[in-house]
């Protein structure tokens, strides 16, 4: 049940009835201060100015047509034209009862579901996952879960880097120093081999040429190169899957559609782009010149899609990739979770595929970019010697710190329980610290902040959840007994908690639309804070009557279910006690 949508719809109808043209819109938002009601309507003053009428007069006229009978108990006009809406407690109570009884907490499926490809994580083969992969992996996974929940058909794709120049380096290097690859060797060893191969590639021109030759051989299906490539891929994806499992990321082998998948499409893509006059020969290479992008001299920017040695580029693969996703996967929308440095590359690809007619002009392509992670000194988050921190090492450090945190609060904790709690807290702390930040901004990685039991952190919200579980247990009622009572919202804090609980639907809708999980994190934190205030002012166990006790227990139960559900959409597990 989406309160924001209900009020927005009625406001729009009231504005039309008041003679306001349909292209004028106002903002409906939850009130920050309780003295301004539960919701505020902003923007009428700007509309009135455009229409040349007094803003208070327009607000009064709109309110006269506003049909919120049974929903709002009071509607006020404040100042020159702000509209404050106070929701009816009885109406809220009926909606709370509906939400508690619903497996989906009263949240309906979207009316027009789409097939949405979510492209995220995308590590390179033969390299260990590092902290640079954490934002794409965690944010992309949460967004995929949320889109899935509201009813879209979500196709998760892990577009791994399993093709390209770095394979030429590795294959050429292995031919020289280590012809056989044991399938059981650790990924860390391959990572070392890659760095050695890269050093040789950068300093030895003859080796660099041999590496480029190996790339072409691989792309042409050379059996020796393919055999080595297959072993490298298998070792890497098996190791990466362990990290996904550890982080509770909903990616598996079935979601892998790497760059190599599109290799057979590339010759036809090149031929087609030439036939359509989009691609031309330039200095031996095949290039597409885009008027939409200029070089430093102001000339159309050339995008190379095939080198003069016949090798293809990431650009070529990405063109084929979008074509495949539209034609074969029937995607209505594609969302990319890659960092901001890829933005121009993606815009160029999108321009090419639209010009080529590979996708409709109206197809939605979104780049949900994200910022960087810094250390406390404001430098890129790396090891002391300046290399990227391995993701496994980061998770191990989080686990160690979580164990110490738990023991500092309870030295007598059972060892098995300690390990389980440490696993949950460590993973949730890292994921929540990532998800609670606006993805477009940079942030500072701070262990003390993310493991704190105060503020907008995973430990705080997990503790709030366990606190409610304890209250429900101490009530000596089972769930069925709790639900037999009526819901009463007689006190201010009962009303405020009910409003916040019913704002879950609109929060999920916003997060799904914008791909910004930090909005959901902010909601869950605010809900936990509001419950704490409710619990402080409204006794539950020692309520004045059984009716009041059961009513407040229902509010507690729905808060518990909402916290658990919201965390699950973020890919975070809950615990029953801490």
UniProtKB/Swiss-Prot annotation:
Statement: the UniProt record of this protein carries the keyword Cytoplasm: yes
A Pfam cross-reference name: DALR_1
Locus of motif 'HIGH' region: 123-133
Keywords for the protein's UniProt record, in alphabetical order: Aminoacyl-tRNA synthetase, ATP-binding, Cytoplasm, Ligase, Nucleotide-binding, Protein biosynthesis
UniProt-annotated location(s): Cytoplasm
GO cellular component: cytoplasm
Major place of residence: cytoplasm
GO MF term set: arginine-tRNA ligase activity; ATP binding
SMART domains for this protein: Arg_tRNA_synt_N (SM01016), DALR_1 (SM00836)
Enzyme class, first EC level, given as a word: ligase
Xref: InterPro entries: aa-tRNA-synth_I_CS (IPR001412), Arg-tRNA-ligase (IPR001278), Arg-tRNA-synth_N (IPR005148), Arg-tRNA-synth_N_sf (IPR036695), ArgRS_core (IPR035684), DALR_anticod-bd (IPR008909), Rossmann-like_a/b/a_fold (IPR014729), tRNAsynth_Ia_anticodon-bd (IPR009080)
GO aspect biological process, one term: arginyl-tRNA aminoacylation
Listed EC numbers: 6.1.1.19
Annotated Gene3D superfamilies: Arginyl tRNA synthetase N-terminal domain, HUPs, Isoleucyl-tRNA Synthetase, Domain 1
Reaction(s) catalysed by this chain's protein: tRNA(Arg) + L-arginine + ATP = L-arginyl-tRNA(Arg) + AMP + diphosphate
Domain of life: Bacteria
Subunit structure comment from the entry: Monomer.
Family to which this protein belongs: Belongs to the class-I aminoacyl-tRNA synthetase family.
PANTHER family reported for this sequence: ARGININE--TRNA LIGASE, CYTOPLASMIC, ARGINYL-TRNA SYNTHETASE
UniProt name for this protein: Arginine--tRNA ligase
Record lineage: Bacteria, Pseudomonadati, Pseudomonadota, Gammaproteobacteria, Candidatus Palibaumannia
